């Protein structure tokens, strides 16, 4: 059986978890405590870079969440989660890569806000929100009259972008200017796979508090 080594609070793991659920696959979840378990020799033997997720399939270990999503799509093609049309495939990939290369690196200053911690550098927060708004506009423009990126059905773009964008509301980043993206987010949040994998805000706060001992949740 497929085995997913994950951490409930890791968005990179959650992409894979959601995809396994959306594909209706049987799998075992193995939780890795990122307070050190990832540095143990048994885990490093699977992933020398000490990151979750890792997918194990009959002794074969795959690291890097996007490589895992591609593996699942190739091995379990139904339901299809990557468009076949060239433009639509490019759209799904662009959304994955823009999330990883543009959105995620820009939101660091927003994390404390998302988790309800006070403070933060107002200039850095404003800069982060400006970068985020460029990504949101890009995504809204890329969505056409279909509900998902390049598709009538959920694609591998959704577990990547759709596990980041809903959290932005917690940092007062509104999607009201982006009606297509807002409808897209709402439809994802209603899916059982999103609901089953949502990390608890309290657990995230507790984890963040151990890393930022000088701050208390507001
Ligand atoms: N590029 C990797 C990133 C994985 C990653 O950064 N995982 C984090 C959790 S979100 C992790 O395992 N951190 C613990 C560590 O690096 O020791 C992927 O997409 O799978």
Regions found by a protein language model. Give the residues of each.
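GST-like domain detector, emphasizing the conserved glutathione-binding G-site
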Residues: 1-126, 215-216
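Short, solvent-exposed turn/loop segments enriched in Gly/Ser/Thr/Pro and often Arg
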Residues: 7, 33, 156, 201-204
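Catalytic cores of transferase enzymes with a strong primary signal for eukaryotic protein kinases
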Residues: 23, 160, 174-176, 193, ...
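Generic structural signal for helix capping and beta-alpha/helix-loop junctions
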Residues: 37-39, 185, 205-206
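Phosphate-coordinating loops and pocket residues in cytosolic domains that bind phosphorylated ligands
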Residues: 45, 83, 161, 190, ...
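GST-like fold's C-terminal all-alpha helical module
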Residues: 99-192
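Acidic/histidine-enriched, glycine/proline-rich intrinsically disordered or flexible terminal extensions
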Residues: 200-218
């Amino acid at each position: 059986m497929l085995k997913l080594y994950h951490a409930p609070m890791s968005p990179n793991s959650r992409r894979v978890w959601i995809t396994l659920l959306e594909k209706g696959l049987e799998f075992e979840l193995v939780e890795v405590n990122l307070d050190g378990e990832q540095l143990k020799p048994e885990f490093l033997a699977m992933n020398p870079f000490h990151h979750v997720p890792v997918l194990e399939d009959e002794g074969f270990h795959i690291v890097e969440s996007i490589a895992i999503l591609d593996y699942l799509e190739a091995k379990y093609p139904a339901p299809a989660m990557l468009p076949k049309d060239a433009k639509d495939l490019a759209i799904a990939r662009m959304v994955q890569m823009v999330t990883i290369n543009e959105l995620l690196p820009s939101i660091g200053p927003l994390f404390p806000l998302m988790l309800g911690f006070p403070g933060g550098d107002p200039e850095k927060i404003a800069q982060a929100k400006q970068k985020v708004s460029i990504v949101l506009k890009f995504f809204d423009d890329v969505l056409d009259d279909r509900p998902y990126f390049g598709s009538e059905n959920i694609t591998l773009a959704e577990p990547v972008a759709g596990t980041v964008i809903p959290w932005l509301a917690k940092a007062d980043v509104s999607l009201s200017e982006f009606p297509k993206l807002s409808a897209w987010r709402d439809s994802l949040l209603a899916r059982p796979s999103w609901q089953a994998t949502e990390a608890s805000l309290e657990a995230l706060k507790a984890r963040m508090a151990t890393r930022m001992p000088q701050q208390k949740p507001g």
